[in-house]
Curated annotation (Swiss-Prot):
Its main location: cytoplasm. It comes from Photobacterium profundum (strain SS9). The keyword S-adenosyl-L-methionine applies. NCBIfam families: prmA. It is an enzyme of class 2 (transferase). GO terms for molecular function: protein-lysine N-methyltransferase activity. InterPro entries: Ribosomal_L11_MeTrfase_PrmA (IPR050078), Ribosomal_PrmA_MeTrfase (IPR004498), SAM-dependent_MTases_sf (IPR029063). It holds the Pfam family PrmA. This is Ribosomal protein L11 methyltransferase. It comes from the Bacteria. The gene is prmA.
Length: 294
């Protein structure tokens, strides 16, 4: 079925209240927020909602919604300026999952590694192929932070090594490490859906017997790894730096990403006390920080 959406501009101070009003008083099925000025996003701390100074609020309605009623409610709301601008659009229904599947293609990272959708044939059967169905979890290889980590893993000697994937998401890094020769990988994530997606993808790739998955509260307390990867965000990388550093064996390696270039210098200071850091590698405003624990 088709849908109708209304988009109007708001500020960080009133965007959430307008979204609540659209949902509670006008019958919107959802309310979402978009950056109106394409400002870089800095992640919030846990429990905090971070919105842009200039925010678009989008309300989604079914095709039968009375948009005259919606507009009248908006015009009479104290949250809305008298001369507010808005845009109403009709959206044709799509099979979004199928459309996404059509646009997810095999991708090569480094010399040996390919990430392939599970429903497509691997282009190089003799290469190191990871078959991926990310489900609801983050990590397909298309984001610069994921690709930077995959390329780094492809350049390491992982044969017989123990790896920790801190924030495993879809399991893409963990499974890539196993396909590249790692003996054992521990995947940790705060999201049960990510744990399930990692488990499913590990089974699909025939490596589930070598992948141990944990929520943070269940992870082993005395484990260290030869290689640790953490593709999360700058805030958690700062906050959890003592934990992440403690997971790296003496002589082991660490790669972290999810960091904007402009955050790299600051984030590096949280790790340079215990690791000899490599030059930062950047791509599309994001970067990878890696190093060696003496």
């Amino acid at each position: 079925m088709p849908w109708i959406q209304i988009k109007l501009n708001a500020t960080a101070e009133n965007a959430e209240a307008i979204g609540d009003m659209l949902m509670e008083e006008t019958g919107a099925l959802s309310a979402t927020f978009l950056d109106a000025q394409d400002t870089p996003v800095f992640e919030p701390m846990p429990g905090e909602t971070r919105l842009w100074g200039d925010t678009d609020v989008i309300g989604l309605y079914d095709a039968e919604a009375d948009m005259d009623f919606v507009l009248n409610m908006l015009k009479n709301s104290p949250l809305i300026a008298e001369d507010f601008a808005y845009k109403i659009e009709q959206l044709e229904d799509k099979d979004w999952e199928r459309e996404w599947m059509v646009n997810f293609h095999p991708m090569r990272f480094g010399r040996r590694l390919w990430i392939c959708p599970s429903w497509r044939e691997a282009p190089e059967p003799n290469a190191v192929n990871v078959l991926l169905d990310p489900g609801l979890a983050f990590g397909t290889g298309t984001h610069p932070t994921t690709s930077l980590c995959l390329e780094w893993l492809d350049g390491q000697d992982l044969v017989g090594k123990t790896i920790i994937d801190f924030g495993c998401g879809s399991g893409i890094l963990a499974i890539a490490a196993l396909k590249l020769g790692a003996e054992k990988v521990i995947g940790i994530d705060i999201d049960p859906q990510a744990i399930q997606a990692s488990r499913d993808n590990a089974e699909r790739n025939g490596v589930s017997d070598k992948l141990a998955l944990f929520l943070p509260q269940d992870q082993p307390t005395d484990v260290q790894a030869d290689v640790v990867v953490a593709n999360i965000l700058a805030g958690p990388l700062r906050e959890l730096s003592p934990v992440i550093k403690s997971l790296v064996k003496p002589g082991g390696k660490l790669a972290i990403s999810g960091v904007l270039e402009i955050q790299a210098e600051d984030v590096s200071t949280y790790y340079s006390d215990e690791l000899a850091l490599d030059p930062v590698v950047a791509r599309d405003e994001w970067c990878r920080i890696s190093g060696y624990k003496a």
